[in-house]
Amino acid sequence: MDIAIQHPWFKRALGPFYPSRLFDQFFGEGLFEYDLLPFLSSTISPYYRQSLFRTVLDSGISEVRSDRDKFVIYLDVKHFSPEDLTVKVLEDFVEIHGKHNERQDDHGYISREFHRRYRLPSNVDQSALSCSLSADGMLTFSGPKVPSGMDAGHSERAIPVSREEKPSSAPSS
């Protein structure tokens, strides 16, 4: 099986229609020079085109789904263990915070931290919220919706993160 290996110089953004990785959720995976100067690098090789869809798919952006029966958030947190994650419900919001202290890896020392806040729909049953972390690092936060007119129960509380031994079945966009 042949695997194409691409030098980082060729993996740069080419202007306003090609998003930068600067604000993506690559928690500490490093930045290339084109992340800081995306327009400058496009003048070097004007005929090279980076795949827009590959950039979007690899960006690690969270996915929020809300249908008639349930509300679900998928978030890639592959660099964090359940002990590093805190999930809280504060009134109509869920706050997901991940932090691990400085530790050594192959390239030196690294520490990571992120904070995400999502608005919960008003009809989500907050007493039945759950959160799990799959073996491949996909955090799944979910809660059922109650029929309109019923009390969804809003309060402040922490949601424990359980670990699953199987990879995530989250749909890829």
From Swiss-Prot:
Acetylation at Lys-70 may increase chaperone activity. SUPFAM superfamilies: HSP20-like chaperones. Zn(2+) 1 binds at H100, E102. Residues 153-167 have a biased composition (Basic and acidic residues). GO terms for biological process: lens development in camera-type eye; negative regulation of apoptotic process; protein refolding; response to heat. The modification Phosphoserine is found at S45, S122. Glycans are attached at S162. Residues 1-63 are annotated as: Required for complex formation with BFSP1 and BFSP2. Residues 52-162 form the sHSP domain. GO terms for cellular component: cytoplasm; nucleus. Residues 144-173 are annotated as: Disordered. One of its GO terms (molecular function) is structural constituent of eye lens. The modification Deamidated glutamine is found at Q6, Q50. InterPro entries: A-crystallin/Hsp20_dom, Alpha-crystallin/HSP_16, Alpha-crystallin/sHSP_animal, Alpha-crystallin_N, HSP20-like_chaperone. Its main location: cytoplasm. Zn(2+) 2 binds at H107. Zn(2+) 3 binds at H154. Contributes to the transparency and refractive index of the lens. Acts as a chaperone, preventing aggregation of various proteins under a wide range of stress conditions. Required for the correct formation of lens intermediate filaments as part of a complex composed of BFSP1, BFSP2 and CRYAA. This is Alpha-crystallin A chain. It comes from Melursus ursinus (Sloth bear). The lineage of its organism: Eukaryota, Metazoa, Chordata, Craniata, Vertebrata.
